[in-house]
């Protein structure tokens, strides 16, 4: 047994170190301290928690001596209690594990402790001086145990509930508030439900009340709207108590009470705010921490913000004074009375409004306010003169306004421009060009100055940099900005570095953000790698596979490699299989710590190894990756351990095959006995909530558990339509139809609003349009139901002040066209505009919003065509468009015909790369883009650099297979991994595969790292070559390559090869590929999907049943030491600080 359980057992049996035989037997008549005598009686009664708390209390005030153990055992013997160490240990372990997996029992036993014992338990939670137990030669580090305890679901919940129930009767209020704070801060606020205020004390003295209020303020964002309202009511109930005026003439709200309320001040009513006395609001604004508090009222509404501003105006503070403006926090986002402002104050306000992006909603109003302030700030001055003083309002400047700027103005304002967030891609392109207009070559100084504008620098400019300047950038803190560059820009930087004569000597110095772009071929040439250097690098799997093998030849300490950051991605299954039992168990923690980096195949290998080495201590979640029969072998006694372990993981990434995932979920339901009875079970289930079937959600979650379950369901991102319908049914049962909903209800249900019907959403759109629009703004880029989008569209239309157009253009007269406000609020719901309406949009509106419109995923072909026509109306023919026009189009560019694409100026690879971000091009369009670049740039295929190949993106697939062979091998090999991400036609992939043979040799020479590097290029392999591949390499095909293999080629795989695909690649096999397979091949595929062991695919029949070891003192579930440490932890009642 490991040191953990041994230490715990020694503690529990009073540290008898004599193995069960006593050296001497003291007389039970010898004096035994009453506390130890009480402890011994509790051991006899089976009250082990009470006994341990008494022991802890005794140790705090007495020196532990060796004879005390013998005295206690003598006392037990005198009571005819014949314990042996093994039997007592077994009883103790069973009891501890009962706490671990049934934290309700912990709650019950804590309720049964006497006041002195409960006091001890709370002190263990509070005081660092209780950080260890020192009992002769054994020291128990309670601080380390504290960190482990809360890994067990439900522990925090039990501690939270018992603290509310008993603490305020046993300890002083300040100590109890501190305990609550520790427990709540470790719970993500999920314990705070609206009914919690019924259990909170109503008579706290001032300091305790302030401290507890501070805890609730810290957890504000993690609590529901209903809970926020309930906590606000509890706080104000206490704050109002000493205030006896009842006629309403004087407000109960004082400056100090506003400070105590903190973010809860946004729940004050309009009337209460308007009733605050000028003296008190002035005193509040004068507090040094008032600005910090007002900076955090993210959910304040315009109405309440303007009410506060009005009261401040009535105080001694002048809101037109610069020092006052600096104190207003987020209230500046709703500043009114602009007619009295001068340019200086407008500039000050604009600077303060940088923080307005943190507001929850109302951003359209913020943008309008910034635009008005921008007009005032530039009044009687040119834009060139005021550019540096406009803060982030400059992002509201149109492309024509930016183009009108002088280069000198941009240089002068660069310290402001380089920090602004929210720039559009086209704006960055214009400003970068303006800044570099006077520079012949990009220098280190320029790069230092550009900040966020660096992303607008052309790739050719990076490629033309001096080597020394480039290395100076990469060795400076500026290297962190490399991650903000596009792939084509990153490759331009790398391409320049690799051209140097001593390029390979510097590969190890390439910063983290760029290192993952270094080619496998270039890694082969570098011999100076070590594990320390790689700790800070981000690695592709192909890089990790090569580097792990390379470094494995230079060290005999695998822990050095496994601790080297992302190098764990490269551990092959053969290495895991070859580890000795002892080494594997010693190293498993490295794998577990980096679990998110492991592939499903690696996890499957770990599961098999653990099963063979130590199935009794195997983490139960690994069973889900083994063949399904292993799940059926889990007995009821192991169910809770299985659920806890699996619930901490993401099942969708652990088990990729949907059929097998269904098997796992059925086992979960079986373990739950078809019901989630309470919130403790919700804690246990964890992320598995997202996979429970609709019928279970609708009928299997009890009303008591529903609130906690709903909190968990909020994080589910891939619920099926059936699951969504079940959630909707439960919500309607709980809250009734939307007609009955309050604002708090609607806010709390915001993550689920898209589940409701069009009629139900119509009600929400009418009652709470702002909440609906806020919800939609958080779902940008998500494919949403049409009903939801139409509801958002309706809510915006209802609040729009737009009038019918008087545009004489044919078909536009009388049409209500979109405004910038409308477009901003609608986000993805812009897909609801009629094409005719989009075509009638005002020119200025189109110019200001083209990038936002280009990002809408739901536009139809007709809508895109209308927007393209609008672009031609505004910008003239495509042949007149500049780079910033093209990059701003987004998906609108998809409407360009082949001839229109050929008219574009595509001489810059960055322009081509912006078009390449779209993946819906037809082959003809892609060919036009490719040809246009070659013609406009003057390059031939043989002249292309590696960054050109990256910049083409999916349009590279339009290259003729014969043209591919003209690409320089030195440029091709640098970007093989990037090209391997493209989904090209089979002939094109075959062409790239032929080119790859020049670099990597024929397929029979390919290694695991080469196969990973090739990606989809490997799908260009021939039938004969595929048959010749070693089956051990099959797991190293990328899943995308498996999907790209034509069915007639895929069917050439042998049954052994198919069985060796591994779970990840097997899950990537398409339906059309399956149709080509024989029954024997399909059976092999099923084995791979099920996680069968690849090297025993013929000898390990599907029907064989796994066997478990005989029951021991440490049942299967968690590693023995961990389980007992956690058990000890529960008894010691430690909590994370």
UniProtKB/Swiss-Prot annotation:
Main location: membrane
InterPro entries for the chain: Stereocilin-rel
Residues annotated as glycosylated: 156, 211, 244, 289, 321, 380, 384, 530, 594, 740, 798
Biological process per Gene Ontology, one example term: multicellular organism growth
Compartmental location: Apical cell membrane; Secreted, Extracellular space, Extracellular matrix
Membrane topology according to the record: Lipid-anchor; GPI-anchor
Highest taxon of source: Eukaryota
Propeptide regions on this chain: 1114-1137
Signal peptide per UniProt: 1-23
Biased composition (Polar residues): 1095-1115
Disordered: region residues: 1095-1119
GO CC annotations, alphabetized: apical plasma membrane; extracellular region; side of membrane
Lipid attachment in record (GPI-anchor amidated glycine): 1113
UniProt entry keywords in alphabetical sequence: Cell membrane, Extracellular matrix, Glycoprotein, GPI-anchor, Hearing, Lipoprotein, Membrane, Secreted, Signal
Tissue: Expressed in the inner ear and vestibule.
Purpose: May act as an adhesion molecule.
Family: Belongs to the stereocilin family.
Family matches, as PANTHER family: OTOANCORIN, STEREOCILIN RELATED
Annotated protein name in UniProt: Otoancorin
Organism: Mus musculus (Mouse)
């Amino acid at each position: 047994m490991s040191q953990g359980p041994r230490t715990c057992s020694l503690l529990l049996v009073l540290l008898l170190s004599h193995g069960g035989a006593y050296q001497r037997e003291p007389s039970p008549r010898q004096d035994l301290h009453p506390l130890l005598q009480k402890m011994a009686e509790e051991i006899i009664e089976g009250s082990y928690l009470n006994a341990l708390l008494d022991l802890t209390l005794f140790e705090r005030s007495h020196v532990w001596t060796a004879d005390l153990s013998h005295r206690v055992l003598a006392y037990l013997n005198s009571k005819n209690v014949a314990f042996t160490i093994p039997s007592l240990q077994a009883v103790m372990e069973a009891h501890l594990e009962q706490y671990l997996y049934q934290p309700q029992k912990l709650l019950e036993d804590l309720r049964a402790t006497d006041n002195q014992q409960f006091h001890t338990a709370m002190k263990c939670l509070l005081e660092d001086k209780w950080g260890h137990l020192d009992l002769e030669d054994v020291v128990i580090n309670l601080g380390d145990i504290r960190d482990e305890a809360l890994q067990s679901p439900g522990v925090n919940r039990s501690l939270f509930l018992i603290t509310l129930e008993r603490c305020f009767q046993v300890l002083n209020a300040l100590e109890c508030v501190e305990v609550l704070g520790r427990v709540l801060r470790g719970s993500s606020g999920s314990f705070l439900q609206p009914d919690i205020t019924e259990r909170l004390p109503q008579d706290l003295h001032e300091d305790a009340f302030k401290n507890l209020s501070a805890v609730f303020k810290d957890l504000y964002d993690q609590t529901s709207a209903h809970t926020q309202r309930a906590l606000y009511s509890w706080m104000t109930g206490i704050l109002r108590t000493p205030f006896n005026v009842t006629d309403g003439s004087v407000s109960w709200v004082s400056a100090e009470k506003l400070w105590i309320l903190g973010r809860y001040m946004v729940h004050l009513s309009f009337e209460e705010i308007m009733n605050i006395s000028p003296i008190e609001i002035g005193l509040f604004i004068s507090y040094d921490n008032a600005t910090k508090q007002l900076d955090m009222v993210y959910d304040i509404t315009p109405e309440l913000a303007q009410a506060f501003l009005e009261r401040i105006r009535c105080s001694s503070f002048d809101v037109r004074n610069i020092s006052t403006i600096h104190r207003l926090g987020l209230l500046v986002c709703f500043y009114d009375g602009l007619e009295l402002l001068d340019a200086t104050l407008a500039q000050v306000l604009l600077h303060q409004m940088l923080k307005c992006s943190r507001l929850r909603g109302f951003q359209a109003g913020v943008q309008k306010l910034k635009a008005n302030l921008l007009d005032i700030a530039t009044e009687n001055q040119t834009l060139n003169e005021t550019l540096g003083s406009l803060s982030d309002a400059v992002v509201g400047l149109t492309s024509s306004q930016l183009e009108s700027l002088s280069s000198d103005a941009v240089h002068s304002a660069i310290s402001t421009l380089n920090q602004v967030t929210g720039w559009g891609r086209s704006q960055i392109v214009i400003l970068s060009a303006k800044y570099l207009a006077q520079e012949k070559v990009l220098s280190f100084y320029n790069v230092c100055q550009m900040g966020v504008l660096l992303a607008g620098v052309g790739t050719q400019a990076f490629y033309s940099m001096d080597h020394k300047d480039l290395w100076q950038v990469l060795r400076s803190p500026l290297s962190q900005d490399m991650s903000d560059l596009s792939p084509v820009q990153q490759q331009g930087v790398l391409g320049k570095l690799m051209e140097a004569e001593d390029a390979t000597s510097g590969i190890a110095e390439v910063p983290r953000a760029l290192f993952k772009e270094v080619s496998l071929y270039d890694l082969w040439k570098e011999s100076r790698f070590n594990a320390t250097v790689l700790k800070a690098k981000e690695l592709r799997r192909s890089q990790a596979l090569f580097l792990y093998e390379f470094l494995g030849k230079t060290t005999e300490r695998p822990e050095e490699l496994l601790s080297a950051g992302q190098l764990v991605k490269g551990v092959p299954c053969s290495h895991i299989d070859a580890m000795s039992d002892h080494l594997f168990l010693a190293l498993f923690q490295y794998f577990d710590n980096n679990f998110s980096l492991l592939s499903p195949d690696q996890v499957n290998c770990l599961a098999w190894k653990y099963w063979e080495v130590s199935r009794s201590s195997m983490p139960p979640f690994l069973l889900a990756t083994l063949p399904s029969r292993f799940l059926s072998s889990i007995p009821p006694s192991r169910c809770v351990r299985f659920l806890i372990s699996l619930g901490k993981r993401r099942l969708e990434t652990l088990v990729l095959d949907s059929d097998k995932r269904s098997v796992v979920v059925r086992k979960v339901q079986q373990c739950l006995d078809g019901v989630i009875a309470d919130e403790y079970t919700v804690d246990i289930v964890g992320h598995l909530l997202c996979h429970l079937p609709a019928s279970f959600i609708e009928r299997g979650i009890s009303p008591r558990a529903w609130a906690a379950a709903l909190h968990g369901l909020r994080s589910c991102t891939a619920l099926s339509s059936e699951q969504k319908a079940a959630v909707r049914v439960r919500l309607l049962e709980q809250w009734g139809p939307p007609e009955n909903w309050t604002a708090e209800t609607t806010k709390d249900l915001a993550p689920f609003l898209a589940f409701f019907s069009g009629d139900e959403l119509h009600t929400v759109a009418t009652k709470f349009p702002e909440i609906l629009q806020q919800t939609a703004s958080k779902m940008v880029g998500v494919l949403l139901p049409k009903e939801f989008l139409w509801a958002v569209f309706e809510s915006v239309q209802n609040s729009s002040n737009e009038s019918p157009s008087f545009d004489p253009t044919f078909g536009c007269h009388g049409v209500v066209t979109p405004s910038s406000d409308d477009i901003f609020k609608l986000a993805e719901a812009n897909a609801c505009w009629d094409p005719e309406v989009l075509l009638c949009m005002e020119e200025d509106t189109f110019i200001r919003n083209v990038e936002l419109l280009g990002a809408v995923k739901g536009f139809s072909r007709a809508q895109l065509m209308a927007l393209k026509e609008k672009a031609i109306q505004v910008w003239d023919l495509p042949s007149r468009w500049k780079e910033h026009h093209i990059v701003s189009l987004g998906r609108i560019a998809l409407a360009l015909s082949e001839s229109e694409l050929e008219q574009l100026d595509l001489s810059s690879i960055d322009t081509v790369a912006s078009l390449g971000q779209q993946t819906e091009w037809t082959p003809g369009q892609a060919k036009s883009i490719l040809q246009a670049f070659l013609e406009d740039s003057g390059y031939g295929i043989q002249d292309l650099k590696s960054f050109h190949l990256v910049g083409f993106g999916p349009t590279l697939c339009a290259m003729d297979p014969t043209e591919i062979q003209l690409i320089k091998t030195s440029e091709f090999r640098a970007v093989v991994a990037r090209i391997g991400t493209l989904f090209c036609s089979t002939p094109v992939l075959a062409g790239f595969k032929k080119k790859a043979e020049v670099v990597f040799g024929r397929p029979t020479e390919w290694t695991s790292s080469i196969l990973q590097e090739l990606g989809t290029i490997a799908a260009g392999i021939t039938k004969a070559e595929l048959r010749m591949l070693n089956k051990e390499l099959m797991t190293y095909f990328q899943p995308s390559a498996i999907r790209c293999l034509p069915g007639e080629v895929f069917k050439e795989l042998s049954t052994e090869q198919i069985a060796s695909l591994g779970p990840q690649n097997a899950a990537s096999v398409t339906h059309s590929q399956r149709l080509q397979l024989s029954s024997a091949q399909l059976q092999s595929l099923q084995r791979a999907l099920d996680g069968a062991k690849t090297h025993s695919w013929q000898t390990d029949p599907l029907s064989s049943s796994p066997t478990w070891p005989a029951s021991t003192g440490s049942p299967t579930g968690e590693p023995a030491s961990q389980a007992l440490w956690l058990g000890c932890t529960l008894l010691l009642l430690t909590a994370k600080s």
